[in-house]
Swiss-Prot record:
It comes from Escherichia coli (strain K12). Belongs to the UPF0386 family. Pfam families: YjhX_toxin. InterPro entries: YjhX_toxin. HAMAP family: UPF0386 (MF_00827). This is UPF0386 protein YjhX. Signal peptide: none annotated. It comes from the Bacteria. GO terms for molecular function: DNA topoisomerase binding.
Length: 85
């Protein structure tokens, strides 16, 4: 599966247990998204366009209106990324 660098970075952050908070308008469409890292910092790579691509590819999902998280079946497909800590 071909993923852009921003999509990969967003998936790696989500794989560490983080979430994508979303805001919907009156018609139910997602108008803005914010992806938070483990430390609670805002991830700038996660834009509305990246969010829509990940959702279209069914890599992320939301259950009962909760924040979007990585799909459990896709969690195993994400390659490990070195964490420089």
């Amino acid at each position: 599966m071909n993923l852009s660098r921003q999509e990969q970075h967003t998936l790696h952050v989500l794989a560490k247990g983080r979430r994508i908070a979303h805001v919907r308008d009156s018609s139910g469409r997602v108008t803005s998204v914010e992806c938070y890292s483990r430390e609670g910092l805002l991830l700038t790579d996660c834009t509305l366009a990246v969010f829509k691509k990940l959702k279209t590819k069914k890599l992320i999902k939301s259950v009962n209106g909760q924040p979007y998280r990585i799909n459990t079946t896709e969690l195993n497909k994400v390659r490990a990324q070195l964490d420089n800590r």
